[in-house]
Amino acid sequence: GTLVFYTIDGRKTGHSIGASLTQVGERLLELGCQTVLCLDGGGSTNLAVTTPDSTTATIINRPSETGRKVTNQVFLVASDRSSGRLDHFYVNAAGDYVLAGSAVSVTASGVDSNYIPMDASYTLSASAGSIAEQEDGRYLLTTPASGSDITVTASGRGAKGSTVVHAIRNPDNLTLKNGASNLTELTVTPGSKTALTAGAVWNHLPLTATNEAFTWSVSGDIG
């Protein structure tokens, strides 16, 4: 069976609108859950995990309230001793959802049978697009402009591991920014230079995007 810990952040402007118990229940049914237990309904809920490529726990959600001095905790623990036996590879992309044609960084780490990270050589392959090793040892996946669900696989010493990167061809909308502010118009001094960045959103999710995925143009004699 599978155990799911499901956390939804509370109402927080620009980040989350929260969810009712009915909405959470419907979502858990969509995930195939059969038995459900509500552990907390407060804005201070924290979900911390130790990913397979680390030995330190990190909070992965964004609580809508501050922490509490007295709390209840549920821990899932495992042995902290390395077995030294390679079990699989943990593959992680800097973005799971990217704008088609963009490049995204991918890393991989060996994981032993006790889920402790270990050094192990590997090769990376992708089911679509292209992948290349960078000078810093990381890999860069360039997604196809046509869009695709891309499986990136690390393999070595008889072990494997994979992750899926979703390259979205048709985003719901594009944004143009000057710094942190979204732009609909811009007034500048003649002869000046303004740094602009573009972004893409799909299904309310910001897509990881690089400049190569955008085509820039201006209208009128403005530069």
Specify the residue positions occupied by each region the protein language model found.
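Gly/Ser/Thr/Pro-rich low-complexity, intrinsically disordered segments
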Residues: 1-215, 219, 223
